[in-house]
């Protein structure tokens, strides 16, 4: 029987990213600021461990794309607004949507499965189904969003010489 989650390091990194987003929101900071602060502290305090590089990547990615991520989540909430969601659910959804849009090495089903698993571990009994439903809707539009982003990047680079 194969392990459903062969990369426990990534799972823990995602969980830590959710923790950082939750903490950042509570403190009125960005996730990138909290990650930077934590890693600086790890450099001076022997009892503080540096963050997994993937946690930092996710924190910075969510910070850089937060408005777009929140707009996309909000567009797929039915009967809810983003600010009415439990803070942990917002953090889980933000991590997962960032992965769906920007983590090219993470298959879409893995991003969704990981988010659902985090919702089971960290949130209410209703959250896993809710998170799965929202991300299922977001997954329907991610190919178009990724293609549009790629086209913008290519046009910004200008015509290739050849």
From Swiss-Prot:
Record GO cellular component, one term: cytosol
Keywords in alphabetical order: RNA-binding, Transcription, Transcription antitermination, Transcription regulation
Domain of life assignment: Bacteria
Gene Ontology process terms (BP): DNA-templated transcription termination; transcription antitermination
A Pfam family recorded for this sequence: NusB
Main function: Involved in transcription antitermination. Required for transcription of ribosomal RNA (rRNA) genes. Binds specifically to the boxA antiterminator sequence of the ribosomal RNA (rrn) operons.
Family membership: Belongs to the NusB family.
Protein name: Transcription antitermination protein NusB
Native source species: Mycobacterium sp. (strain KMS)
